C-alpha cells in the first residue's frame, strides 16, 4: 500500500477507536473528542510554536452546535488542522532546529521539495478540485526543484570520487615514504649490528640482547609481510591488465572476423592463419611470463631462506657468519649465472621454435586450405572455453587472496600469543623465585593434594577412555553390521539375477522349441493336406491339448517359483534372526569383557595404591618403625580381603556365564525345533499341492496321453532311482548335521576364548608380582651395597636426603608414568584380543558363506535334475509322435532327412548345456579355491604378527629392566642433574625407537594390503578374461554352425527347385556344372596363391563375379527351356541373395561390436598395467628416499670432515636418478612400440606378454620383500650398536660431558643443515613430479593418437580374418555339397520314376474329368474372360507404377551417387590431412624429446665441469651410453617411418580397391548406402562431441593441477612459518635449559597419550578408507558385470529375433513352393501380390533393424562416456587419496611443531595446572571432540563427493531429456507469469475501480444523510449552523492550555 492509503486507513481506525455508537449513528461526543485531542494532538497543544493551530481548533469547536461530530465533520476538522499545521509542524515537534543545525545550505532545496511533496500528499480531495493553472505551476516548480536536486547529487558523487582518488594517491605516497624510511632504518640497524658485534656481549646483558633481537625480528617480519602484500597487489594489477588486454584483443579479433566474413574466402583464410599465429605467440608469451614469474618467486623464496640462515648463523658465531655469507653470495652468483644461461638457452630455443613454426606454418598454408572451414567452429569453442577458464581463474585468485588474508590474520594472532607467552614466562620465573623459599614448608601438603588431584584426574581420564572405547566399539559394530548386510544383499541380488537368467533361458528355449515344432507341423500339414485330412484333425486336437499341458506346466513352474521365493524369504528372515542373535551374544560378550576390564583396572589401581603406600612406609621407617608395622599389617589384611573379593567376583561371573550359556543353548534348541517343524509343514503342503495338480491334469488329459505320460514316468523312475521321499529325508539329515556342526563350533570357540582370557589374567598377575619382587630385591641390594666408611656414609646420607626431597617432587610423576606404561600394555593386549575376535568372526563368516554356497549348489543341482526330467519327458513325447508319423507316412526319405536334422539340433543343444554346466562348475571351484587361499594367507599373517609382537614386547620389557638397573647404579655413583639428563635421553631414545617400530609395522601392513589387493584384482581379471575368451569361442562356434546350416539349407533348397523344375535337362546341367566346377577350382587355386600375397578383399569380388557368371550361364540355359520359370526364379534368387547379404552384414556388424568390446577391455588392462608399473616405480623411489634419509641420519653423527664425502655421494645419486629418468624416457617409446605390436599382431603374443609381465612383477615383488627384510635386519643391528655405544659413553660419563655438549651443539647445526638439504630435496622432487605430469599428459595424447591410427588397421585385419574364415567354410561346404548332390540325384531319380507313374494315373483321371467338365468350362469361359480382362488392366497399371518407381529410383540413385562421390572425396581429403597431422605430431614429439635430451646433456655437462676430474671414466661411460641410446632411437625412428610408409602404401592400395568395388556395387547397395552415410555423419558428430568432452576433461585436469600448485604454495608458507617458530623455540630453549631438563619427564609422559590416541585414530581412519575403497571397487565391478550381462542378454535377444525372422522367411519360401506345385494356374496372380508384400515387409524389417542399430550406436557413446567418467572418478579418487596423505603428513609435521610449543606451555604452566587441571581436562576433551568433528566433516565431504560423482554418472544419461524439459518448462513458466501479471493488473484495476465506486457511494450516502438533517457541509461556507455553549469542559481545557503558552 502507498503511504497516502495507509494514512487514510489510520484516520478511519482512529475515528472508530474514539467513536460512541448511538441511535443516530456513529459520532464523537465532547468527551471522546477531548480524549482524542489529548492523545493525538497533545504535541501541538502543549507546545504550540504557532498559535494559529490552537485558535483554529477552538474556532472549529465553537462552530459546532450539536456537541457531536460526524465522520464528515471529523474529516474537515482534520484537513483544516493539517492545512494550518503544515508549515508549523516542524516547529511543533521540535525537529526543525536539529535539521537546520545538521544540514547546510545545499539541503534547503531538498527540504522544500520534501515539504512540497508532503503537502501534495496530504492535501484533501477538495483542494484537488481547484483550478488547473495553479496545479500546472506547482508541477513545473516541482520539476525544476527535482532537476536541481539531481544535479546536486551528481556533483556530490563526482566530488566523492575525486576525494577517493586523492586518498588513494596520498596512501600510495605514504606507503612509499614508509618503505623508504624502513629501508633507511634497516640499513642503520645493520650498521649498528655490524659495529657492535664484538661489544654486545660485554656492554649489554643477555636479556637486553634477546629483547633487541626479538624486536628486530618482529620488525623484519612486519616488513616481509608488507612486501608480500605489495607483491600481491602488484600481481592483482598485473592480472587485471592482462585481462583487459585479453578483452581488447578479443574485441579486435571479433571485428576482424566480421570483416573477413564480408571479404573473399582467400582473405579469410589468410587472416585466420595470422590470428592463429598471434594466439600461439600470445600463449607462448603468457607461458613465458608465467614461467618467469615462477622463477622470480622461487628466487625470492631462496633469498628469504638465505637471509634467515644468515641471521641464525650470526647469532651463533661471527666467523661462521662471514664465511657463510661469502659462500652464499658465491652460490647466488652461480645460481644467477645458471638462471641467465638457462634463460639464454630458452630464448635460443624459443627462437628456433619460432623459426620452425614459421616453416611449418608455410607448409600448413599450402596444405591446410580446406581444413580451415572446420577449424573455425573449433576456434570459437576454444575462445569460449578460454573465457570460462579465465573467469574461473579470477574466482580462484580471489579465493587465494582471501585465504592469504586469513593466514596473515592467523600469523598476527600467533605472534601476539608468543608475546603473551613470553610475558607469562617472565612472570613465572619471578613467581618461582618467590616460591622457592616457601616450597620446603609446603612440600608435604602439595604432595598430598597432588596425589588426590591425580587420582581424580586418572579417574576422569579413565572415564573418558571408557566412553571413547564404547564409541569405537559401537562404530565397529555398526561397520560390521553394514558390511554383513551389504554382503547378504549382494549375494541375494546375485542369486536373483541368476534365477532370472535361468528363467529367461528356459523360456527362450521353450519358445524356440515351440516355434520349431509349429513350423515343422505347418510344413507337414501343407504337404499332406489331400491325403491326411483326418490325421490333421487329430493332430490339431493333440496340439491344443499339448498347448494346454504346456500352459499348465508353466503355471506349475510359476507356482513353484513363487514357493521358492517364499522359502528364500523365510530363509533370509531366519538368517537375519540368527545374525541378530549372534550380535546380541557378541554384545553380551563385549559387556562382560568390559566389566572384567573395569575390574582389572580397579585391581591395578588398588595394587598401585598399595605400592605407593609401601613406598611411603619405607620413607617413614627410619622415623616411625611402629607405624610401618601397623601399616604392613593393615596392608596384608587389605590384600587378603581384596583377593577374597576378587575370587568371589570371578566365581560369580563364571556362574553367570554358565547360566547364560545354558539359557542361550536352550533357546537355540527351541528355535531349531520350530524351524524343523515349519520346514516339514511347508514340504508337506508343497507335496500335497503337487499331487492335487497332477490329479487335475490327469482328469483333463485323455486316457491315451495319460498312458504315454505314465509310461514315461515309469522309465524315468527306472533311470533315476531317487524318489522324492528319500531326497526329503536326506535334506533333513544334512540340515541337522550342519546345525550340529555349527553348535559344536560355537561352543568350541567360546571355550577357547574363556581359556585365553584366563591365561591372560594369570600372566598379568604373575607379571605384577614379579615386578614387585624384583623392585624389593633391588632395593635390598642397594641397602647392602651402601655401607662404606663413616664420612662417605654421612655424605651419602646428605645426598640421599636431598635425593629424597627431590624424589618427593617427582615420585607422583614417575608413578603416573608407570601407570601409563601399564595402561599401554593393557591397551595393546586389548587390541590383540579384538584382533583375535575379528579373526574368529571372519572365520565364522567364511564358514557360513561356504555352507550357504553348498546349499545353493544343492538347490541348483535339484533344479537341474528337475529340468532334465522335464526335457526328457518332452523329448520322449516328441520321439513318440515322430514314430507315429513315420508309421503313418510309411517312412518317406524326406521325413527321414528332417528327423536327422532335428536329432542333430538336439545333440548340439545338449552339448551346449553340458558345456555351460562344466563352465559353471569350474567357476565355482575357482572361487572356492581363491577364498581358501585368502583365508590361509590371513591366518599366516596373523600368526606372524602375533609372534613379532610377542618378541617385541619381551625385548622391550627386558630393555626396560636393564635400563632401570643401570639407572639405580648410576644414581648411587653419580650426582643428580646428569643422571636425570641421561634418564631423559634414554627414555627419549626408547620412545623414538618404539615410534620407529610402529611406523615400520604400519608401512609393512600397508604394503601387504596393497599387494593383496593387486594380486586379487589381477587374479579376478585373469578369470574374467578367461571366461570371456571361452564365451567368445563358444559364440564363434555357434555362429559358424549356424552359418553352415544356413548355407547347407539354402543350397539344398536351390538344388531341389532345380531338380523338380528341370528333370529333363539334368544331364546337360551336370556336365556343364562339372566343367564349370573344374574351372572354378582352378581359379580358386589361383586365388589362394594371390591371397597368400595380398590377403585382402579382392577375393570376395572375384568370387562374386564368378558366381554371377555361373548363375548367368545357368539362367541362359534355363531360359532356353523355361522362360517364364526362369524369370520368376531369378527374382526370387535375387531377393534371397539380397536378404542373405543383409543378414551377413548384420552379423558382421554384431561381430564387430563383440570384437570391439574385448579390445576396450584390453586397453583398460594395458592402462592398468601401466598404472601398476608406475606405482611400483613410485614405491621403489619411496624406498630409495627412505634409505637416503637413514643414511643422512647416520652421517649427521659423524664429524665435519665426512660432509664432503656425503656431498659427493649425493651428487652421484642425483646422476643415477637422472640416468634412470633417461632410461625411463627410452623405455617408454619402447613400451609404446610394444603396445602397437601387441595390438597389430595376434592374441597369442599378447597372452605371452601378459605372462611375462606377471612373472616379472612376481620377481620384483619377491626382490622387494627380500630388500625390506634385509633393511629391517640392518636397522636392528644399527640400533643395537647405538645402544652399546650409549652404554659405553654412560660409563665414561664424567669425562664426556663436555664432549656431549659440544656434540649437541654440532647436532643442532647439522639438524639445521639437514633441514635445509631436505627443503632442497623437496623442491627437486616437486620439479620431478611436475616433469612427470607433463610427460604423462604428453604420453596420453600420443596414445590417443596411436589408438586412432590403429583403429582402421584393426578393422582391416578383422575383415581379412573373417574373409579367410568364410573362404575356408565355403570350401568345406562345397566339398560336402558335392557328396550330398550325388546321393540326392539317386534319390531324385527314384522319386522321378514314382512321380511319372503317378502322373500317368493322374492324366487318365484328368481326361475323364475333362470330358465331364468341358461343358461346365464352356459356361465359365465368359466369366473367365471378364476376369482376365480385369487382371490385364491391373497388370498394366502395375507395369506403369513399376516404371514410375523405376524412374524415380534411378533419379534418386544418381543423386545419391553424386552425394556419395562428394562424401568419399571429402573422406579421402580428411584421411590425408589426418595422416599429415600425425606425421607432424610425430616429428614434433621427436624434436621435443631431442630438445629434452640436449637440455639434460648440457645440465650434466655443467654439473660435471664443477666436479673433480676424477670422474672422467664415468663421463666417458655416460657418453657411450648416450650414443647407444641415440643409435637405438634413430633405429627405432627409421623403423617407425618404414612402418608408416608401408601402412600408407597399404592404405592407398586398399583405397583403390575399395573405390573400384564401390563403383561396381553402387547399383546393388543404394538403399544401404543412404543409411550408412547417415550413420557416418552421426558418428562424426559424436566424434566431435567426444573431442569437446575430452577438451573439457583436460580443462578440468588443468584446474586440478592449479589447485595442487596452490596447495604446494600454501605448504611452503606453512613450512616457513614452522621454521620461524622453531627458531624462536631454540632461543627459548637456550634460556631455559636447566628448567627443561628438570621437567622433561613430565612433558614426555604427557606427550605419549595424545600420540597414542592419534595413532589409534589414524589406524581407524585408514581402516575406514580401505573399507570404503573396497566397497567402491566392489560396486564398480558389480556395475561392470551388470553391463556385461545386459549386453549379453541384448545380444542373445537379437540373435533370437534374427533366427525367428530367418525361420519365418524360410517357412514362407517353402509355402510358396508348395503353392506353385499344387496351383500352377493361380500362381501368377498371387506371386506378384506376395512379392509386393514381401518387399514392403522387408523394407519395414530393414527400417526396424537400422533403427535398432542406430539406437545401439547412440547408446554406445553414452556407455563409453560412463566408463570414462568412472575412470576419471577413480583417477580423481586416487589423486585425492594422495593429496590426503600429503596433507596428513603436513598435518603431522605441523602437529609436531604445535606439540613442541604445547609442551613448553605445559612446562611453564605446571603450577597453574594444579589449580586448573579440571579445566584443562575439559579443554582436552573438547579439543578431541573438535578433532572428531573435523574428521567426521572430512568423511562427509568425501561421501558427498562420491555421491556427486555417482549423481553425475546417473544424471549424465538424462541430461538431454532434462534440458528439453527445462526449456519447455521455462516457456510454460514464462507464459504463466505473463498470464499472472496480466491477471494481477486486471485485478488491481478492478480493485481501484471498486474502491472508487465505494468511495463515491459513501460520499453520496453521506450527502443524502446531510440533506436528511437539513445541512450541507461545503468547504467554503458556514459549516455549523449555530454557536455552541462556551461552558463546556473541553472548551475550558483548551483555554487553560492556551493561557499557559501565551506570552
Swiss-Prot record:
Checking PROSITE patterns in the record gives:
EF_HAND_1, EF_HAND_2, S100_CABP
SMART domains reported in the protein's UniProt record: S_100
Matching entries from InterPro entries are given as: EF-hand-dom_pair, EF_Hand_1_Ca_BS, EF_hand_dom, S-100_dom, S100/CaBP7/8-like_CS, S100_Ca-bd_sub, TCHH
Biased composition range(s): Basic and acidic residues: 197-209, 608-684, 724-781, 789-812, 859-872, 950-992, 1065-1085, 1092-1111, 1152-1162, 1214-1263, 1274-1371, 1492-1524, 1533-1673, 1682-1691, 1876-1912
Q: What ranges does the record give for the region 10 X 30 AA tandem repeats, renumbered to this chain?
A: 906-1204
SUPFAM superfamilies the UniProt entry points to: EF-hand
Q: Where is the composition biased (Acidic residues)?
A: 1052-1064, 1142-1151
Gene Ontology cellular component list = cornified envelope; cytoskeleton; cytosol
What is known to happen upon mutating residue 1400 to P?
A: Found in a renal cell carcinoma sample; somatic mutation
According to the UniProt record, where is the region S-100-like? 1-91
- Region annotation (9 X 28 AA approximate tandem repeats) ranges: 425-683
Which Pfam family, an example, fits this chain?
S_100
Q: Does the keyword Zinc apply?
A: no
Biological process, per Gene Ontology: intermediate filament organization; keratinization
Occurrences of domain EF-hand (ranges): 23-48, 49-84
Q: How is it modified after translation?
A: Substrate of transglutaminase. Some 200 arginines are probably converted to citrullines by peptidylarginine deimidase.
Tissues in which the protein is found? Found in the hard keratinizing tissues such as the inner root sheath (IRS) of hair follicles and medulla, and in the filiform papillae of dorsal tongue epithelium.
Q: Where is this region: 5 X 13 AA tandem repeats of R-R-E-Q-E-E-E-R-R-E-Q-Q-L?
A: 314-377
Quote the subunit structure annotation. Answer: Monomer.
Family that this chain belongs to: Belongs to the S100-fused protein family.
Print the domain comment field. Consists of nine domains. Domain 1 contains two EF-hand calcium-binding domains. Domains 2-4, 6, and 8 are almost entirely alpha-helical, configured as a series of peptide repeats of varying regularity, and are thought to form a single-stranded alpha-helical rod stabilized by ionic interactions. Domain 6 is the most regular and may bind KIF directly by ionic interactions. Domains 5 and 7 are less well organized and may induce folds in the molecule. Domain 9 contains the C-terminus, conserved among different species.
Functional note = Intermediate filament-associated protein that associates in regular arrays with keratin intermediate filaments (KIF) of the inner root sheath cells of the hair follicle and the granular layer of the epidermis. It later becomes cross-linked to KIF by isodipeptide bonds. It may serve as scaffold protein, together with involucrin, in the organization of the cell envelope or even anchor the cell envelope to the KIF network. It may be involved in its own calcium-dependent postsynthetic processing during terminal differentiation.
State the protein's name: Trichohyalin
Q: What gene name does this entry carry?
A: TCHH
Amino acid at each position: 500500500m502507498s503511504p497516502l492509503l495507509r494514512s487514510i486507513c489510520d484516520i478511519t481506525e482512529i475515528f472508530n477507536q474514539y467513536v460512541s455508537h448511538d441511535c443516530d449513528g456513529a459520532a464523537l461526543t465532547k468527551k471522546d473528542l477531548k480524549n482524542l485531542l489529548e492523545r493525538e494532538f497533545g504535541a501541538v497543544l502543549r507546545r504550540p510554536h504557532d498559535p494559529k493551530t490552537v485558535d483554529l481548533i477552538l474556532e472549529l469547536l465553537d462552530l459546532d452546535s450539536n456537541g457531536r461530530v460526524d465522520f464528515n465533520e471529523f474529516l474537515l476538522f482534520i484537513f483544516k488542522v493539517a492545512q494550518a499545521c503544515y508549515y508549523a509542524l516542524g516547529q511543533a515537534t521540535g525537529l526543525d532546529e536539529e535539521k537546520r543545525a545538521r544540514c547546510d545550505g545545499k539541503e534547503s532545496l531538498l527540504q522544500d521539495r520534501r515539504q512540497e511533496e508532503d503537502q501534495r500528499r496530504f492535501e484533501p480531495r477538495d483542494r484537488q478540485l481547484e483550478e488547473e493553472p495553479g496545479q500546472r505551476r506547482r508541477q513545473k516548480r516541482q520539476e525544476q526543484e527535482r532537476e536541481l536536486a539531481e544535479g546536486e547529487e551528481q556533483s556530490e558523487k563526482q566530488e566523492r570520487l575525486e576525494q577517493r582518488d586523492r586518498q588513494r594517491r596520498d596512501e600510495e605516497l605514504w606507503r612509499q615514504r614508509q618503505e623508504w624510511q624502513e629501508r633507511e632504518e634497516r640499513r642503520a640497524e645493520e650498521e649498528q649490528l655490524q659495529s657492535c658485534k664484538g661489544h654486545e656481549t660485554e656492554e649489554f646483558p643477555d636479556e637486553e640482547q634477546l629483547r633487541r633481537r626479538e624486536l628486530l625480528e618482529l620488525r623484519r617480519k612486519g616488513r616481509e609481510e608488507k612486501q608480500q602484500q605489495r607483491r600481491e597487489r602488484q600481481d592483482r594489477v598485473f592480472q587485471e591488465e592482462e585481462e583487459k588486454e585479453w578483452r581488447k584483443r578479443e574485441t579486435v579479433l571479433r571485428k576482424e572476423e566480421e570483416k573477413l566474413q564480408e571479404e573473399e574466402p582467400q582473405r579469410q583464410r589468410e587472416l585466420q592463419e595470422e590470428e592463429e599465429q598471434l594466439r600461439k605467440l600470445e600463449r607462448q608469451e603468457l607461458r613465458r611470463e608465467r614461467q618467469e614469474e615462477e622463477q622470480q618467486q622461487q628466487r625470492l623464496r631462496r633469498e628469504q631462506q638465505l637471509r634467515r640462515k644468515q641471521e641464525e648463523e650470526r647469532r651463533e658465531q661471527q666467523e661462521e657468519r662471514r664465511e657463510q655469507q661469502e659462500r652464499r653470495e658465491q652460490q647466488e652468483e652461480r645460481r644467477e649465472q645458471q638462471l641467465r644461461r638457462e634463460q639464454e638457452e630458452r630464448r635460443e630455443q624459443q627462437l628456433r621454435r619460432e623459426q620452425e613454426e614459421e616453416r611449418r606454418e608455410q607448409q600448413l598454408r599450402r596444405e591446410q586450405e580446406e581444413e580451415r572451414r572446420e577449424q573455425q567452429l573449433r576456434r570459437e569453442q576454444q575462445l569460449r572455453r578460454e573465457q570460462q577458464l579465465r573467469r574461473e581463474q579470477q574466482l580462484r585468485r580471489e579465493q587465494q587472496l582471501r585465504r592469504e588474508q586469513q593466514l596473515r590474520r592467523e600469523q598476527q594472532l600467533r605472534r601476539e600469543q608468543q608475546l603473551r607467552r613470553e610475558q607469562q614466562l617472565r612472570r613465572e620465573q619471578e613467581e618461582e623465585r618467590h616460591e622457592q623459599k616457601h616450597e620446603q614448608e609446603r612440600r608435604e601438603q602439595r604432595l598430598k593434594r597432588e596425589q588426590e588431584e591425580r587420582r581424580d584426574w586418572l579417574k576422569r581420564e579413565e572415564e573418558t577412555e571408557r566412553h571413547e572405547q564404547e564409541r569405537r566399539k559401537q562404530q565397529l559394530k555398526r561397520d560390521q553390521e553394514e558390511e554383513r548386510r551389504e554382503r547378504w544383499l549382494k549375494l541375494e541380488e546375485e542369486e536373483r539375477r541368476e534365477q532370472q537368467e535361468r528363467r529367461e533361458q528356459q523360456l527362450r528355449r521353450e519358445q524356440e522349441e515351440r516355434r520349431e515344432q509349429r513350423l515343422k507341423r505347418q510344413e507337414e500339414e501343407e504337404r499332406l493336406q489331400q491325403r491326411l485330412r483326418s490325421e490333421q484333425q487329430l493332430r490339431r486336437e493333440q496340439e491344443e491339448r499339448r498347448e494346454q499341458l504346456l500352459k499348465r506346466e508353466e503355471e506349475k513352474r510359476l507356482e513353484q517359483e513363487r514357493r521358492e521365493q517364499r522359502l528364500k524369504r523365510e530363509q533370509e528372515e531366519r538368517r537375519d534372526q540368527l545374525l541378530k542373535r549372534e550380535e546380541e551374544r557378541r554384545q553380551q560378550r563385549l559387556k562382560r569383557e568390559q566389566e572384567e576390564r573395569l575390574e582389572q583396572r580397579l585391581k591395578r589401581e588398588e595394587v598401585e595404591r598399595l605400592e605407593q603406600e609401601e613406598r611411603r612406609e619405607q620413607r617413614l621407617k627410619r622415623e616411625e618403625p611402629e607405624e610401618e608395622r601397623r601399616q604392613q599389617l593393615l596392608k596384608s589384611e587389605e590384600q587378603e580381603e581384596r583377593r577374597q573379593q576378587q575370587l568371589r567376583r570371578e566365581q560369580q561371573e563364571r556362574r553367570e556365564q554358565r547360566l547364560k550359556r545354558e539359557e542361550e543353548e536352550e533357546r537355540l534348541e527351541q528355535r531349531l525345533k520350530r524351524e524343523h517343524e515349519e520346514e516339514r509343514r511347508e514340504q508337506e503342503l508343497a507335496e500335497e499341492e503337487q499331487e492335487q495338480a497332477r490329479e487335475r491334469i490327469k482328469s483333463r488329459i485323455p486316457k491315451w496321453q495319460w498312458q504315454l505320460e505314465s509310461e514315461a514316468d515309469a522309465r524315468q523312475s527306472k533311470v533315476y532311482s531317487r524318489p522324492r521321499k528319500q531326497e526329503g529325508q536326506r535334506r533333513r539329515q544334512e540340515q541337522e548335521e550342519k546345525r550340529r556342526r555349527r553348535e559344536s563350533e560355537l561352543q568350541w570357540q567360546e571355550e577357547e576364548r574363556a581359556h585365553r582370557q584366563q591365561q591372560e589374567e594369570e600372566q598379568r598377575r604373575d607379571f605384577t608380582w614379579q615386578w614387585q619382587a624384583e623392585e624389593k630385591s633391588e632395593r635390598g641390594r642397594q641397602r647392602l651395597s651402601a655401607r662404606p666408611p663413616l664420612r662417605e656414609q654421612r655424605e651419602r646420607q646428605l645426598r640421599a636426603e636431598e635425593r629424597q626431597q627431590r624424589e618427593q617432587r617427582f615420585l607422583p610423576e614417575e608413578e603416573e608414568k608407570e601407570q601409563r606404561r601399564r595402561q599401554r600394555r593393557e591397551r595393546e593386549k586389548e587390541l590383540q584380543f579384538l584382533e583375535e575376535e575379528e579373526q574368529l568372526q571372519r572365520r565364522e563368516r567364511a564358514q557360513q558363506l561356504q555352507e550357504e554356497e553348498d546349499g545353493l549348489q544343492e538347490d541348483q543341482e535339484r533344479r537341474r535334475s528337475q529340468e532334465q526330467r522335464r526335457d526328457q519327458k518332452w523329448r520322449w513325447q516328441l520321439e513318440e509322435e515322430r514314430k507315429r508319423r513315420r508309421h503313418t507316412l510309411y517312412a518317406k526319405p524326406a521325413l527321414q532327412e528332417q528327423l536327422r536334422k532335428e536329432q542333430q539340433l538336439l545333440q548340439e543343444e545338449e552339448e551346449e548345456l553340458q558345456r555351460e554346466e562344466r563352465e559353471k562348475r569350474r567357476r565355482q571351484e575357482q572361487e572356492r579355491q581363491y577364498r581358501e587361499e585368502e583365508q590361509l594367507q590371513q591366518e599366516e599373517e596373523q600368526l606372524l604378527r602375533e609372534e613379532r609382537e610377542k618378541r617385541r614386547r619381551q625385548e622391550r620389557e627386558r630393555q626396560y629392566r636393564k635400563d632401570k638397573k643401570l639407572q639405580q647404579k648410576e644414581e648411587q655413583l653419580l650426582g643428580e642433574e646428569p643422571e636425570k639428563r641421561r634418564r631423559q635421553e634414554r627414555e627419549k631414545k626408547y620412545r623414538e625407537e618404539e615410534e620407529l617400530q610402529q611406523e615400520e609395522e604400519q608401512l609393512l601392513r600397508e604394503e601387504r594390503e596393497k599387494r593383496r589387493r593387486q594380486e586379487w584384482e589381477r587374479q579376478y581379471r585373469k578369470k574374467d578374461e578367461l571366461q570371456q575368451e571361452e564365451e567368445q569361442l563358444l559364440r564363434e562356434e555357434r555362429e559358424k554352425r549356424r552359418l553352415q546350416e544356413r548355407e547347407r539349407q539354402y543350397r539344398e533348397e536351390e538344388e531341389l527347385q532345380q531338380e523338380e523344375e528341370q528333370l529333363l535337362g539334368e544331364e546337360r546341367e551336370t556336365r556343364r556344372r562339372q566343367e564349370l566346377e573344374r574351372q572354378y577350382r582352378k581359379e580358386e587355386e589361383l586365388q589362394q596363391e594371390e591371397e597368400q600375397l595380398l590377403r585382402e578383399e579382392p577375393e570376395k569380388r572375384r568370387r562374386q563375379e564368378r558366381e554371377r557368371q555361373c548363375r548367368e550361364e545357368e539362367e541362359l540355359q534355363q531360359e532356353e527351356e523355361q522362360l517364364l520359370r526362369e524369370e520368376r526364379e531369378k527374382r526370387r534368387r535375387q531377393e534371397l541373395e539380397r536378404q542373405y547379404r543383409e543378414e551377413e552384414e548384420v552379423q558382421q556388424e554384431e561381430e564387430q561390436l563383440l570384437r570391439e568390446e574385448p579390445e576396450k577391455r584390453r586397453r583398460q588392462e594395458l592402462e592398468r598395467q601401466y598404472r601398476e608399473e608406475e606405482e611400483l616405480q613410485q614405491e621403489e623411489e619411496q624406498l630409495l628416499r627412505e634409505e637416503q634419509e637413514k643414511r643422512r641420519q647416520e652421517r649427521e653423527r659423524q664429524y665435519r670432515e665426512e660432509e664432503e664425502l656425503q656431498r659427493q655421494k649425493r651428487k652421484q645419486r642425483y646422476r643415477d636418478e637422472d640416468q634412470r629418468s633417461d632410461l625411463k624416457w627410452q623405455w617408454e617409446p619402447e613400451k609404446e612400440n610394444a603396445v602397437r605390436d601387441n595390438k597389430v599382431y595376434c592374441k597369442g603374443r599378447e597372452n605371452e606378454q601378459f605372462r611375462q609381465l606377471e612373472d616379472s612383477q612376481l620377481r620384483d615383488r619377491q626382490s622387494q620383500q627380500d630388500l625390506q627384510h634385509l633393511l629391517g635386519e640392518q636397522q636392528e643391528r644399527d640400533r643395537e650398536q647405538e645402544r652399546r655405544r650409549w652404554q659405553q659413553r654412560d660409563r665414561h660419563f664424567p669425562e664426556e660431558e663436555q664432549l656431549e655438549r659440544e656434540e649437541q651443539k654440532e647436532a643442532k647445526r647439522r639438524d639445521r643443515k639437514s633441514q635445509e638439504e631436505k627443503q632442497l630435496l623437496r623442491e627437486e622432487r616437486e620439479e620431478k613430479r611436475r616433469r612427470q605430469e607433463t610427460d604423462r599428459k604428453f604420453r596420453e595424447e600420443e596414445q590417443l593418437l596411436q589408438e586412432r591410427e590403429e583403429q582402421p588397421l584393426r578393422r582391416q585385419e578383422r575383415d581379412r580374418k573373417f574373409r579367410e574364415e568364410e573362404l575356408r567354410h565355403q570350401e568345406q561346404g562345397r566339398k560336402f555339397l558335392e557328396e550330398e548332390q550325388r546321393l540326392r540325384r539317386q534319390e531324385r531319380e527314384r522319386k522321378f520314376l514314382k512321380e511319372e507313374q503317378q502322373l500317368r494315373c493322374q492324366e487318365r483321371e484328368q481326361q475323364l474329368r475333362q470330358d465331364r467338365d468341358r461343358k461346365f468350362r464352356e459356361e465359365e469361359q465368359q466369366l473367365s474372360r471378364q476376369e482376365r480382362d480385369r487382371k490385364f488392366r491391373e497388370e498394366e497399371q502395375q507395369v506403369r507404377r513399376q516404371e514410375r518407381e523405376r524412374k524415380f529410383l534411378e533419379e534418386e540413385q544418381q543423386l545419391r551417387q553424386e552425394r556419395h562421390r562428394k562424401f568419399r572425396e571429402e573422406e579421402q581429403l580428411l584421411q590425408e590431412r589426418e595422416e599429415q597431422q600425425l606425421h607432424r605430431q610425430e616429428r614434433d614429439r621427436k624434436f621435443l624429446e631431442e630438445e629434452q635430451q640436449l637440455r639434460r646433456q648440457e645440465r650434466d655437462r655443467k654439473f660435471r665441469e664443477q666436479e673433480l676430474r676424477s670422474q672422467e671414466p664415468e663421463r666417458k661411460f655416460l657418453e657411450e651410453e648416450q650414443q647407444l641410446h641415440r643409435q637405438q632411437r634413430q633405429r627405432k625412428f627409421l623403423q617407425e617411418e618404414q612402418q608408416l610408409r608401408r601402412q600408407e602404401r597399404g592404405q592407398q592400395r586398399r583405397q583403390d580397391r575399395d573405390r573400384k568395388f564401390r563403383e561396381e556395387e553402387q547399383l546393388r547397395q543404394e538403399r544401404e548406402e543412404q543409411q550408412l552415410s547417415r550413420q557416418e555423419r552421426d558418428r562424426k558428430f559424436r566424434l566431435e562431441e567426444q573431442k569437446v568432452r575430452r577438451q573439457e576433461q583436460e580443462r578440468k585436469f588443468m584446474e586440478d593441477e592449479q589447485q595442487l600448485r596452490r596447495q604446494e604454495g600454501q605448504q611452503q608458507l606453512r613450512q616457513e612459518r614452522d621454521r620461524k617458530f622453531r627458531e624462536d623455540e631454540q632461543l627459548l630453549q637456550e634460556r631455559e635449559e636447566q628448567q627443561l631438563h628438570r621437567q622433561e619427564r613430565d612433558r614426555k609422559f604427557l606427550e605419549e597419550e595424545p600420540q597414542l590416541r592419534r595413532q589409534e585414530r589414524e589406524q581407524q581412519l585408514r581402516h575406514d578408507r580401505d573399507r570404503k575403497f573396497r566397497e567402491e571397487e566392489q560396486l564398480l565391478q558389480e556395475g561392470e558385470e551388470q553391463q556385461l550381462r545386459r549386453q549379453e542378454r541384448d545380444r542373445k535377444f537379437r540373435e533370437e529375433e534374427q533366427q525367428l525372422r530367418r525361420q519365418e522367411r524360410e517357412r514362407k519360401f517353402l509355402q510358396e513352393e508348395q503353392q506353385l506345385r499344387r496351383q500352377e494356374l493361380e500362381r501368377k496372380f498371387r506371386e506378384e501380390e506376395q512379392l509386393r508384400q514381401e518387399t514392403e515387409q522387408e523394407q519395414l524389417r530393414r527400417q526396424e533393424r537400422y533403427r535398432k542399430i542406430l539406437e545401439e550406436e547412440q547408446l554406445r557413446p553414452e556407455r563409453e562416456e560412463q566408463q570414462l567418467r568412472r575412470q576419471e572418478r577413480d583417477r580423481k579418487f586416487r589423486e585425492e587419496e594422495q593429496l590426503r596423505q600429503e596433507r596428513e603428513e603436513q598435518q603431522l609435521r605441523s602437529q609436531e611443531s604445535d606439540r613442541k610449543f604445547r609442551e613448553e606451555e605445559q612446562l611453564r604452566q605446571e603450577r597453574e595446572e594444579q589449580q586448573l587441571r579440571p579445566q584443562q581436562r575439559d579443554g582436552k576433551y573438547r579439543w578431541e571432540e573438535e578433532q572428531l568433528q573435523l574428521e567426521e566433516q572430512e568423511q562427509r565431504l568425501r561421501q558427498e563427493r562420491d555421491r556427486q560423482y555417482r549423481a553425475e554418472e546417473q544424471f549424465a544419461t538424462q541430461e538431454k531429456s532434462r534440458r528439453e524439459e527445462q526449456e519447455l518448462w521455462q516457456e510454460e513458466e514464462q507464459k504463466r507469469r505473463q498470464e499472472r501479471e496480466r491477471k494481477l493488473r486486471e485485478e488491481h484495476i478492478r480493485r481501484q475501480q471498486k474502491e472508487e465506486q465505494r468511495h463515491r457511494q459513501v460520499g453520496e450516502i453521506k450527502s443524502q444523510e446531510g440533506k436528511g438533517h437539513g445541512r450541507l457541509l461545503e468547504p467554503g461556507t458556514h459549516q455549523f449552523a449555530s454557536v455552541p455553549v462556551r461552558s463546556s469542559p473541553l472548551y475550558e481545557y483548551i483555554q487553560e492550555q492556551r493561557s499557559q503558552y501565551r506570552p
